[in-house]
A protein has these predicted regions:
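Short acidic capping loops at alpha-helix termini that bridge into adjacent secondary structure
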Residues: 88-94, 115-117, 164, 227-230
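Conserved active-site segment immediately N-terminal to the catalytic lysine
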Residues: 200, 216-230
Length: 230
């Protein structure tokens, strides 16, 4: 009988994919389904992107690439960050990975080990807590407060930091609440983090372009005082 490592028992799953599978089964049975279980747009990949991807393959742009990703793509990402967030990022600091979960997994494994503490938003994306536990670190939830429109209290987060804290995970706009942290609270958090140089920050901003009611998205990239640990 196969024996898996103990840490595999600490790796949870994302139930949204179970909902997706059930919804697709019902759709095949002819049911009219509106699936709210997974973060996927209701439109297909735009045609010009499909055409360019197909053309690149036909032109021979495949095979192994540099580990961080091809330079033209990293330069394009840097240009997009400058355009949308007003920050300059050296393309040499950009790494292209196949999806957000891979980024989270790598970042958490870089800092997570027995005895370490990692702070993560709660309620939040379930993979945060799952991978923290997989790494052997202690998962410390930072509450997102309903009375603050599911934002956090910067002072409360800073009070949770100890000498064992290795990583602070932020997600704004947040999954699943949709809450966005206001600039004043992020200013306060960053000012406090200056006193905790041993703490790295993982800023999950995947929903930065899904913002309504004129709400401002504040990127952690715009704070040079923590750029070396972001």
């Amino acid at each position: 009988m196969l024996r898996l490592s103990e840490k595999m028992n600490r790796l949870g799953t994302e139930t949204a994919f179970e909902v997706l599978a059930r919804a697709e089964t019902l759709a095949r049975e002819g049911r009219d389904i509106i699936n709210l279980g997974i973060g996927q747009p209701d439109f297909k990949t735009p045609g010009h992107i499909v055409e360019e991807a197909t053309k690149a393959l036909r032109d021979g742009h495949h095979g192994y690439t540099p580990s961080p990703g091809i330079l033209p793509l990293r330069e394009a990402v840097a240009a997009d960050l400058q355009l949308r967030r007003g920050v300059e990022v050296n393309p040499e600091r950009i790494v292209v990975v196949p999806g957000g979960k891979v980024t989270m997994f790598f970042a958490i494994l870089m800092f997570g080990e027995p005895g370490a503490e990692i702070l993560y938003p709660n309620p939040g994306f379930p993979i945060y807590e799952s991978v923290i536990q997989f790494s052997g670190a202690t998962a410390v939830p930072t509450p997102l407060l309903e009375e603050r429109d599911y934002s956090f209290d910067a002072d409360a987060v800073l009070d949770q930091i100890t000498s064992n804290t290795r990583l602070l995970i932020l997600n704004s706009p947040a999954n699943p609440t949709g809450g966005a942290v206001p600039r004043a609270e992020i200013d306060k958090l960053v000012a406090g983090l200056v006193d905790h140089p041993h703490v790295a920050v993982l800023s999950d901003e995947i929903y930065s372009r899904i913002s309504y009611d004129g709400r401002e998205h504040v990127s952690l990239c715009s704070y040079p005082e923590i750029a070396d640990r972001l």
